[in-house]
UniProtKB/Swiss-Prot annotation:
Domain of life of the source: Eukaryota
SUPFAM superfamilies: Second domain of Mu2 adaptin subunit (ap50) of ap2 adaptor, SNARE-like
Record organism: Schizosaccharomyces pombe (strain 972 / ATCC 24843)
Gene name of this polypeptide: apm1
Cellular component aspect of the GO annotation: AP-1 adaptor complex; cell division site; cell tip; clathrin-coated pit; clathrin-coated vesicle; cytosol; endosome; Golgi apparatus
Membrane topology, as annotated: Peripheral membrane protein
Assembly with partners or alone: Adaptor protein complex 1 (AP-1) is a heterotetramer composed of two large adaptins (gamma-type subunit apl4 and beta-type subunit apl2), a medium adaptin (mu-type subunit apm1) and a small adaptin (sigma-type subunit aps1). AP-1 interacts with clathrin. Interacts with sad1.
InterPro entries: Adaptor_comp_med_subunit, AP2_Mu_C_sf, AP_mu_sigma_su, Clathrin_mu, Clathrin_mu_CS, Longin-like_dom_sf, MHD
PANTHER family linked to this entry: AP COMPLEX SUBUNIT MU
Domain MHD: 167-425
UniProt family annotation: Belongs to the adaptor complexes medium subunit family.
Protein name as it appears in the record: AP-1 complex subunit mu-1
GO biological process, any: Golgi to endosome transport
Keywords: Coated pit, Cytoplasmic vesicle, Membrane, Protein transport, Transport
Cellular compartment(s): Cytoplasmic vesicle, Clathrin-coated vesicle membrane; Membrane, Clathrin-coated pit
Length: 426
């Protein structure tokens, strides 16, 4: 529960505010920045939750603004932080950019949104699709249509009633991003899998969906066995449509989905991951005038799978020139802005090996410079459809609509791709 919401600039000046409960003086916001600076100086780090004289200051920082909630109650700080994050997402959906200028340019719209997303200090709806049915923006003005959508007052705020499709379909994508750092000898230094289940729902009415995965915890709790592998997910996060109480009780993922595309859940796995594509790179310096690279790339995933649009980014000396390349597959480009050569392989089948040889001139490089250059790792980018590193599987996706009683077709796809860090040290 929040008593008031403020949007401040970096100097702590109020851009816009909304008092919901009138139980605290609005002037206390002036203490926010001094209090924040004092805590950072004492503790050596910042914290998103501050308390002073019985008032809680809960905030997030985005670009050049602070979104601040003040509360006199003993509120759930995490709940308020999630609300502020979702409020920021709503503003971004409306303005494209959340910054001081966009807030000032859309004062009327911001006030309308603040009135709808919170009522008497209690969060209401932060689903942009629902808000856009009620509040629309044209040339920085707001048009309000009555009556409000039923979803605004429903328990199911993320979905409107009366949705109809001629063809009822659900597309489910399991997307896994692999972060990996490996040493030159093949030892995996660090690895993790970040996964998400993304749905595109084109379903009429108010459908009930149940999703079954090869969840290890589920089968152990039920004392059942399953043919094939099971997976143990960590840090699982769900969209608000998922019935958490039921999941905690019997691990069933049941929900009434929003219309269109959304991320149903995300998860992490920290198990040791074998490099999906292994790269060995050897370089030889010839009399300080040129450098030669011998590169081998091997796909270490299942033979029936194919990696698409593989990029192998190999560092080279910054002032290397006159590149010449030979490769058994794909093509190589010199990227001087990255001080690297980029080996592009359109299709890389599992179990295959490809080779590349490169030769470049060294007009001014010194031996010690080359030693420093070797410390830069090889980076990889790729996407492998119909494959998951973790082995996660969708066992079933059941769709029921008790009133309309239609048959819907679910489509399931899998893809594994590189994460933000996929590198092999040389």
């Amino acid at each position: 529960m929040a008593s008031a919401i403020f949007v401040l600039n970096l100097k702590g000046k109020v851009i816009i505010s909304r008092d919901y409960r009138a139980d605290i003086p609005m002037s206390v916001v002036e203490k926010f920045l001094p209090l924040k600076s004092e805590v950072e100086e004492e503790q050596g780090f910042s914290t998103p939750c501050l308390t002073h004289e019985g008032i809680n200051y809960i905030y997030i920082h985005h670009n050049d603004v602070y979104l601040l909630a003040l509360s006199k109650m003993n509120s759930d700080a995490m709940e308020m932080l999630v609300f502020l994050r979702k409020m920021a997402d709503v503003f971004i959906d409306y303005f494209k950019e959340l910054q001081e200028e966009s807030i000032r340019d859309n004062f009327v719209l911001v006030y309308e949104l603040l009135d709808e997303i919170m009522d008497f200090g209690f969060p209401q709806t932060t689903e942009t699709k629902i808000l856009q049915e009620y509040i629309t923006q044209t040339s920085n003005t707001v048009k309000k249509h009555a009556p409000p959508p039923i979803a605004m007052t429903n328990a199911i705020s993320w979905r409107s009633e009366g949705i109809h499709y001629r063809k009822n379909e659900v597309f489910l994508d399991v997307i896994e991003s692999v972060n990996l750092i490996a040493a030159a000898d093949g030892t995996v230094i660090q690895s993790e899998i970040l996964g998400k289940v993304r749905l595109k729902c084109y379903l009429s009415g108010m459908p009930e969906l149940r999703l079954g995965l090869n969840d290890k915890v589920l089968f152990e709790a039920a004392g059942r066995t399953i043919k094939g592998n099971t997976v143990e997910m960590e840090d699982v996060k769900f969209h608000q449509c998922v019935r958490l109480a039921r999941f905690e009780n019997d691990r069933t993922i049941s929900f009434i989905p929003p219309d269109g595309e959304f991320d149903l859940m995300s998860y992490r796995m920290s198990s040791n991951v074998r490099p999906l594509i292994w790269v060995e790179c050897e370089s030889i310096v010839h009399s300080g005038s040129r450098i030669e690279f011998m590169v081998k790339a091997k796909a270490q995933f299942k033979k029936r799978c194919i990696a698409n649009n593989v990029q192998i980014i190999i560092p080279v000396p910054e002032d290397a020139d006159s590149p010449r390349f030979q490769t058994s597959n794909g093509h190589v480009q010199y990227a001087p802005e990255q001080a690297a050569m980029v080996w592009n392989i359109k299709k890389f089948a599992g179990g295959k090996e490809f080779f590349m040889r490169a030769e470049m001139g060294l007009p001014s490089v010194k031996n010690e410079d080359i030693q420093v250059q070797k410390k830069r790792p090889v980076q990889l980018k790729f996407a492998i459809p119909y494959f998951t590193t973790s082995g996660i599987q969708v066992r079933y996706l059941k769709i029921t609509e008790p009133k309309l009683n239609y048959h819907a077709m679910p489509w399931v796809r899998y893809v594994t791709q590189n994460g933000t860090e996929y590198s092999i040290r040389q």
